[in-house]
């Protein structure tokens, strides 16, 4: 690092210094409109990162293990249905059928909300209300129609 304000003094990094950055668009912006707010990065910035790794979405077993460990009060059938829903939601996202992704954090939030709503509603209504509150209420009308179709198929 060169500090031009300090007479061009060079600060050497610690030998164990590492930096990791994440990004959904590999710094290229978002030509398909799938990541709102994404902006292209300059090639000078991108050139500073020498190793690029593509990290896929969690697979079904990984999602199941995560739900078991983080939302232990979720009933087995709810967990299985939620896992299936997330898989189909991700498939719809990766094939550009919907613009809204679902992250592991979103999946866990949905699981927690289902558990909490089970104290207020019967099982089916708890799931539907949780899906509305966590996922569907923030969707575009087009995404909502596609995701509601997935919800109706899995949770009916």
Where are these regions (language model features)?
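C-terminal regulatory/interaction module of P-loop NTP-utilizing enzymes
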Residues: 1-156
């Amino acid at each position: 690092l060169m500090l031009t304000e300090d007479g061009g003094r060079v600060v050497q990094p610690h030998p164990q210094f590492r930096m990791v950055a994440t990004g959904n668009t590999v710094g290229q912006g978002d030509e398909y409109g799938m990541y709102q707010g994404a902006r292209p990065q300059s090639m000078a910035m991108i050139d500073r990162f020498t190793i690029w790794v593509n990290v896929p979405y969690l697979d079904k077993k990984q999602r199941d293990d995560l739900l078991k460990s983080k939302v232990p009060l979720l009933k087995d059938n709810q967990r299985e249905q939620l896992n299936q829903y997330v898989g189909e939601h991700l498939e719809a996202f990766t094939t550009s059928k919907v613009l809204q992704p679902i992250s592991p954090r979103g999946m866990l939030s949905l699981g927690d909300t289902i558990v909490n709503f089970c104290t207020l509603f019967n099982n089916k209504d708890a799931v539907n209300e949780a899906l509305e509150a966590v996922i569907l209420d923030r969707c575009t009308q087009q995404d909502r129609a596609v995701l509601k179709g997935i919800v109706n198929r899995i949770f009916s």
